[in-house]
């Protein structure tokens, strides 16, 4: 199972994720309590091996902002969490994750407008996009409704429920941020436990 640890701001947290087998490291460039600058992400990325993908999280960025981060960090993947047009997701300089909030158990009608992107399902937004620590209603989503083989599940995951999420959705990857935090800070033990649990699902 591919595991993405998101919202990292400190070298010690990046090390905890990488050392315990994370496959993707997420840096948040959108307005958030986990926001980092391109310069900060560049410094943190120096300690990330080439086999671990670096992901930048954005909400309605300009094309200039995307290009600056892709080159400056550098990023392997951009994660779009706003109302970005499909053309912004069709790019050759980075892979793309397009995030969709699942509201009232319904999938967005435009989910198929992004054929080349990973599709990330998340809980509805609160003050900021993503990172709310809440799950969407899993019971109302039928895995058969999702034709993507690049499905990523996010929203309220933790070491206690990630196995159920994986068995239910059979996703390409799982994505976590607040679920590996204690008092708003990344917790190395929670990171270790989550990755071990997620990768233990057969």
Swiss-Prot record:
Q: Which GO terms describe its molecular function?
A: phosphoribosylanthranilate isomerase activity
CDD domains from the entry? PRAI
Q: In which pathway does it act?
A: Amino-acid biosynthesis; L-tryptophan biosynthesis; L-tryptophan from chorismate: step 3/5
The protein's matches in InterPro entries, at most eight in alphabetical order, are given as: Aldolase_TIM, PRAI_dom, RibuloseP-bd_barrel, TrpF_fam
Q: Which domain of life is it from?
A: Bacteria
Supply the enzyme class, top level.
Answer: isomerase
**UniProt xrefs under HAMAP family:** PRAI
Q: What is this protein called?
A: N-(5'-phosphoribosyl)anthranilate isomerase
């Amino acid at each position: 199972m591919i595991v993405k640890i998101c919202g990292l701001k400190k070298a010690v947290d990046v090390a905890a994720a990488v050392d315990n087998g994370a496959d993707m490291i997420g840096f948040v460039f959108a307005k958030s309590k986990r926001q980092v600058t391109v310069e900060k992400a560049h410094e943190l990325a120096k300690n990330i091996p080439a086999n671990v993908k670096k992901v930048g999280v954005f909400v309605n960025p300009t094309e200039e902002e995307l290009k600056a981060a892709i080159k400056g960090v550098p990023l392997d993947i951009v994660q779009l969490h706003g109302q970005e047009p499909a053309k912004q997701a069709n790019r050759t300089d980075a892979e793309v994750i397009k995030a969709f909030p699942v509201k009232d158990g319904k999938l967005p009608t435009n989910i198929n407008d992004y054929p080349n992107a990973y599709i990330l399902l998340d809980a509805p937004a609160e003050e900021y996009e993503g990172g709310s620590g809440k799950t969407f209603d899993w019971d109302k989503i039928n895995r058969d409704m999702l034709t993507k083989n690049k499905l990523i599940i996010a929203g309220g995951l933790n070491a206690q429920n990630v196995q159920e999420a994986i068995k239910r959705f059979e996703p390409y990857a799982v994505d976590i941020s607040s679920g590996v935090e204690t008092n708003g800070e990344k917790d190395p033990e929670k990171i270790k436990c989550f990755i071990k649990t997620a990768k233990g699902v057969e």
